[in-house]
Amino acid sequence: MNKEVFATKTAIILGDRDGIPGQAIEACIKTTGAHVAFSTTECFVUTSAGAMDLENQKRIKALADEFGAENIIVILGGAEAEASGLACETVTTGDPTFAGPLAGVQLGLSCYHVVEDAIKEAVDPAVYEEQIGMMEMVLDVDAIKAEMQQYREEPVEA
């Protein structure tokens, strides 16, 4: 993904207290020219059954309605592959726990983890290294990439 793609996107950032915080992701994403509409840092593993925070689901749905799903990109900072995958599933095919506003709602949003190559290559390398480089060394980046790819490859039913 290149910077030109980001210039037309509205970013929703879901950082993780135990992974990469929203503020660090936001600093990176701002170097791409994307408009950051919402940025937060949550505890992915603290929420019940790994479900996305209900208020965040509500906010994401409202932003998708406001800007159009095709104009949104969700960037995650989860420490664990499985938790990141659940968040990705929630914003693409709907809340798998059926607990929140996105239960049964297939937004089909583009969703990436900040350590994925598509994001890393679009971000200013110096800012990425400063904000994320240290955490990248302790995360299981390969597992995160594989999990995220799996959810992007699942078809979203209309």
From Swiss-Prot:
One of its GO terms (molecular function) is glycine reductase activity. InterPro entries: GRDA (IPR006812). It comes from the Bacteria. It catalyses: acetyl phosphate + [thioredoxin]-disulfide + NH4(+) + H2O = [thioredoxin]-dithiol + glycine + phosphate + H(+); acetyl phosphate + methylamine + [thioredoxin]-disulfide + H2O = sarcosine + [thioredoxin]-dithiol + phosphate + H(+); acetyl phosphate + trimethylamine + [thioredoxin]-disulfide + H2O = glycine betaine + [thioredoxin]-dithiol + phosphate + H(+). Keywords: Oxidoreductase, Selenocysteine. The keyword Oxidoreductase applies. Belongs to the GrdA family. This is Glycine/sarcosine/betaine reductase complex component A1. It comes from Photobacterium profundum (strain SS9).
